[in-house]
């Protein structure tokens, strides 16, 4: 299903499928981010006049709101992989919807491949749907053996604004974004959504803007490491005056911030790239693709006509890549290889939109053999099955399995977010901050 931002894919399609009685089982919808999963479930529940957890619920790592009466369950992508590994026939599940499939995360690609095998071998009644506003639909439709349905939806017009000339090398990126935001603020009405690559850039732009905007303008950061309550506050309408939401790509898809009429796109995105030197992924900052720029601009046209200010020129726009790379091409395949081994099939036995590169998969399998997760023939070991139960990189899971619970805090610091990142303190104080996040240590 292809439809522009604001057409109603995320919040209308599951409810329409339920109303049409297309399946007697539960409808499972995958979202790439936890905030989007909760927000989508809450919006659908609000639409039908029920609290979350009745007909519509959600399940993400660490929390869930579902009940025996739940018919639509919104989950993050890793949840589906775990469900398939535990019960391959997906009992009580009638349909699986892959929302925002253009992001092509490893979990989404693997989940679709496993679901296709389940549908072919065990569940010929299982309905599979892939949705996006910017999907390269042809290859996906071919793998799914499914028709492409395109809807124009009812997104509002968004007027693009480009820079007159490329940014001078003497101007810092954050300053350029702040300048563009101030221009947009003076030329338009309504609240503003500013896209930045990461938390550091958000804080620096925040510092540049806070003394230049008027008292009726609220600045609201929005990034993945924030608590959910703070994220909810950021996407809520401004209580008075205007709001400037400074966000990472967390706000790129599946979210509607009601009073946003203006988008400022910094033109950069942060993605995970596999680093052979460290054997793990690292975050790199790259130019956005046309697909990502389209998604971002669409945030300004969700509820009314809007404007999108791009921090690049019209000429530079034509040089953007069409789509971001699939994670299966650029990311770390160690966890992916472990899941395949638990499943018991090689990649050649599954239908992937983009098959994994043989050499990079072999490297990942070699790491798993070194950790004791695979035997010499590449088969899963009991230790490997234990590693697969952790929502962690296999290296960190191995550390916990080997060193015991004392290693859990170090794994949490490495896998999630150091609460004292950027502060020069020793490990003991960092773990203390992790145990007591409300305690003031500095």
Per-region residue spans from a language model:
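C-terminal helicase lobe and adjacent C-terminal extensions/tails of nucleic-acid helicase motors
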Residues: 335, 354, 369-375, 391-442
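P-loop NTPase motor module signature
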Residues: 1-399
